[in-house]
Amino acid sequence: MDVPLASKTFPSPSPSKREQCNIDGHKSSSKHADLNPHVDDSVLGIILGGGAGTRLYPLTKKRAKPAVPLGANYRLIDIPVSNCLNSNISKIYVRTQFNSASLNRHLSRAYGSNIGGYKNEGFVEVLAAQQSPDNPDWFQGTADAVRQYLWLFEEHNVMEYLILAGDHLYRMDYEKFIQAHRETDADITVAALPMDEERATAFGLMKIDEEGRIIEFAEKPKGEQLKAMMVDTTILGLDDARAKEMPYIASMGIYVISKHVMLQLLREQFPGANDFGSEVIPGATSTGMRVQAYLYDGYWEDIGTIEAFYNANLGITKKPIPDFSFYDRSAPIYTQPRHLPPSKVLDADVTDSVIGEGCVIKNCKIHHSVVGLRSCISEGAIIEDTLLMGADYYETEADKKLLAEKGGIPIGIGKNSHIKRAIIDKNARIGDNVMIINVDNVQEAARETDGYFIKSGIVTVIKDALLPSGTVI
């Protein structure tokens, strides 16, 4: 089990890191690297909580997108926060706007008021959207979300701002990202994914020169426009064979921006721009600023839709190596310490699945599924290709007895129920002999009053929903 964050210390980087070397092994002469390159006291992390999450609805009905549960024990926000902490970045702000109560609660419980770092001054602090005489509107995009709190970010004595999204699944060493920014004397550095032609049409692409400097942008190009965006990805570090397979680079929506550049862009040059990706970054390129690409050639998933979220979760059960592993001790993923008992599995057949803490599983079959915290699965149930998010609390035996007397249904999965290719949100009450198998192969349906939606053929049962015994979906 990963060590709870509260019990783990985050040492300051070794003084030996203060003297950086470039690829050739010589001391860097970069104007940035001449300054203190200690990321722990020179970089401020800013995680953007995102919009209303309409494509992830109904999972975002009662929570912000970064607060959506992930991988049985975690939440999406744990990914960028953990990446920061593992990269020795311990001063972190999280910008929120929609349904932020559960996100705020999770962050305060998981990361506390002091998380170590440089001079023991680390923090993870939530900044909610607010209205003021100067800003009567809620924030309108990624750049506007930063601009509204620029007065606060400016107070920090840092060299760069690290702008991150709160709904991506990946593991990245931001120290290398930031060092590349400094060694290239960049004003802005954009994290980039190598792409093949099939995937490239769904992303915003970038074109670079022979020094890795971004010179052109194109949003979801096709045909001849797509071919015009081909680049030599060996410039960014791919070998010849892989560069041939991946001749495009797409923006990950992750940026390192020098402090003085950020202030200049958002206040002076583009005071009305709302979005980094479509307005501020291309604008900076057009005005002659040095905007560099930094290649990230690892697993990355934008958890923007129900289908992407479902696939990312089920991907952690993949054999022999999952798409994303929560078992990497060199870069662990931290979360809220809940002090739950071990899961109890009684006469159950469980294969190719991940089981969270505190579950009670009785005489049932579970295959290729992720079972979340405090899940209760009754006798005879069959769970296949499914994500169960679990529950926020246990019901006592007295509660269950009282429910039974009133004809109610306890939290969890009832006896002899069959669930396949579904997402069951927290605290759902699934009765006995319920079939959630999409019998009619429906691809899209909104049945909110009945407690479920279907998107991309995946049935999603709403948080706190009740499906009576005998229900068939």
From Swiss-Prot:
Pfam families: LbH_GLGC (PF25247), NTP_transferase (PF00483)
Domain of life: Eukaryota
Principal localisation: plastid
Subcellular location: Plastid, Chloroplast; Plastid, Amyloplast
Regulation: Insensitive to 3'phosphoglycerate and orthophosphate.
Tissue specificity statement from the Swiss-Prot or TrEMBL entry: Abundantly expressed in the whole grains, a slightly less abundant expression is seen in leaves, while a low level expression is seen in the roots. A greater expression is seen in the endosperm than in the embryo and pericarp layers.
Keyword hit for Cytoplasm: no
GO biological process, alphabetically ordered: glycogen biosynthetic process; starch biosynthetic process
InterPro entries in UniProt: ADP-Glc_PPase, ADP_Glu_pyroP_CS, NTP_transferase_dom, Nucleotide-diphossugar_trans, Trimer_LpxA-like_sf
Spans traversing the lipid bilayer: none
Keywords assigned: Allosteric enzyme, Amyloplast, ATP-binding, Chloroplast, Nucleotide-binding, Nucleotidyltransferase, Plastid, Starch biosynthesis, Transferase, Transit peptide
GO MF entry, a single one: glucose-1-phosphate adenylyltransferase activity
Basic and acidic residues biased stretches: 16-36
GO terms for cellular component: amyloplast; chloroplast
Enzyme nomenclature, EC number: 2.7.7.27
Catalyzed reaction equations: alpha-D-glucose 1-phosphate + ATP + H(+) = ADP-alpha-D-glucose + diphosphate
Keyword match GTP-binding: no
Pathway listed: Glycan biosynthesis; starch biosynthesis
Region (Disordered): 1-36
Family: Belongs to the bacterial/plant glucose-1-phosphate adenylyltransferase family.
Quaternary organization: Heterotetramer.
Function: This protein plays a role in synthesis of starch. It catalyzes the synthesis of the activated glycosyl donor, ADP-glucose from Glc-1-P and ATP.
Protein name per Swiss-Prot or TrEMBL: Glucose-1-phosphate adenylyltransferase small subunit, chloroplastic/amyloplastic
